[in-house]
């Protein structure tokens, strides 16, 4: 038996979750947009996924959390739907093309054929742009990263022949969603004095990249049993690394060692970034770097308790449950009303 508590996080990476009022507000929105029928099962699915918001952004107020909840709604609904294989490759590509167009141009790709998810994504884009106000460079940075992420979904889901950790991590640099989540943290504070050019600083890029690796590592362990259950585990290193290093136990040791190394690098890069930063921007940069640490620590806390990953066959003790009230996410995702 294994435990997710084997992942060690510094104390300042962990905060109690924020108030969950935003989740119920956003659930009403997705029902109004007809993404879900309003019932107990869809609420449980929605809460079980979008509760990640209050863990990833624990210091944010209600208005900030609304933006973050809408962002994670788009991510989870789109990713779950495409991962579920309820669409064929052509339909998947078409949906991604339409969503990219909405984020890029702020309107619908085909005004004669508009799905509910397209309507919601446009609503999310418009409300987020309004929230950011004049800091359009923050908004544009977010658009770049979410478009990159959307375009990474299908290639990763269909990369069923991954057989080495380097190739996997190259995919996960974008597909983990950490760059997008961090850019969301940046636009949640539109009054920040941080220079958007921080994103082209190679040390900050490595800082964010390692954050992506850490989140992917945590998610791989948390979602392992769920992915086996749905035959989506071929791209999970807990599976494919067994062909190289032997037992699950050996693979888990490799992953924990990798996790410790990248977390140490994150801390060291943050120290140097703050040291080199102009004094007038230092507090804002510190807010941004701590935001990423809270995203990673929050993802860990959420993974320990969320119903999304519960499976009696999980190798991790925190996720084992026979609770009949726990609804596997794939029992709901096929009810998403994308058409």
Swiss-Prot record:
Primary enzyme class: lyase
Catalyzed reaction equations: (2E,6E)-farnesyl diphosphate = (-)-beta-barbatene + diphosphate; (2E,6E)-farnesyl diphosphate = (E)-beta-farnesene + diphosphate; (2E)-geranyl diphosphate = (Z)-beta-ocimene + diphosphate; (2E)-geranyl diphosphate + H2O = linalool + diphosphate
Keywords annotated in UniProt: Lyase, Metal-binding
UniProt entry tagged with the keyword Lyase: yes
Enzyme Commission number(s): 4.2.3.-, 4.2.3.15, 4.2.3.47
Induction info: Expression is almost undetectable in vegetatively growing cells and increases during development induced by starvation. Expression is highest during he ultimate stage of mature fruiting body (approximately 24 hours after induction).
Gene Ontology BP annotations: sesquiterpene biosynthetic process
NDxxSxxxD/E motif, short sequence motif: residues: 219-227
Function of the protein: Terpene synthase that converts its substrate farnesyl diphosphate (FPP) into the sesquiterpene beta-barbatene as a major product as well as (E)-beta-farnesene as a minor product. Is also able to convert geranyl diphosphate (GPP) into a mixture of monoterpenes including (Z)-beta-ocimene, linalool, beta-myrcene, limonene and alpha-terpineol.
Official protein name in the record: Terpene synthase 9
Recorded name of the encoding gene: TPS9
């Amino acid at each position: 038996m294994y435990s997710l508590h084997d992942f060690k996080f510094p104390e300042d990476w962990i905060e109690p979750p924020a108030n969950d009022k935003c989740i119920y507000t956003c659930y009403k929105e997705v029902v109004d947009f007809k993404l879900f029928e309003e019932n107990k099962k869809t609420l449980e699915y929605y809460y079980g996924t979008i509760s990640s918001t209050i863990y990833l952004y624990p210091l944010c107020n209600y208005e900030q959390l609304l933006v973050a909840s809408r962002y994670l709604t788009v991510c989870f609904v789109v990713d779950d739907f495409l991962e579920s294989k309820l669409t064929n490759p052509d339909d998947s590509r078409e949906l991604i093309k339409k969503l990219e167009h909405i984020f890029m141009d702020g309107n619908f790709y085909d005004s004669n054929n508009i799905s509910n998810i397209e309507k919601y994504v446009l609503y999310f884009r418009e409300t987020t742009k309004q929230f950011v106000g004049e800091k359009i460079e923050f908004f544009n940075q977010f658009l770049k990263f979410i478009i990159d992420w959307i375009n990474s979904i299908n290639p990763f889901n269909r990369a069923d022949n991954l057989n080495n950790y380097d190739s996997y991590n190259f995919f996960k640099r974008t597909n983990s969603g950490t760059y997008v989540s961090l850019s969301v943290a940046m636009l949640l504070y539109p009054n920040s004095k941080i220079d958007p050019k921080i994103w082209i600083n190679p040390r900050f890029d490595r800082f964010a990249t390692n954050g992506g690796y850490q989140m992917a590592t945590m998610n791989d362990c948390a979602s392992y049993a769920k992915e086996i259950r749905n035959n989506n585990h071929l791209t999970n290193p807990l599976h494919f690394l067994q062909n190289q290093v032997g037992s699950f136990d050996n693979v888990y040791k490799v992953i924990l060692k990798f996790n410790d190394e990248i977390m140490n690098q994150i801390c060291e890069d943050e120290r140097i970034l703050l040291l080199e930063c102009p004094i007038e921007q230092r507090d804002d940069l510190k807010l941004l770097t701590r935001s990423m640490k809270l995203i990673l620590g929050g993802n860990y806390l959420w993974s320990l308790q969320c119903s999304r990953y519960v499976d009696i066959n999980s190798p991790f003790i925190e996720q084992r449950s026979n609770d009949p009230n726990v609804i596997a996410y794939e029992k709901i995702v096929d009810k998403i009303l994308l058409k």
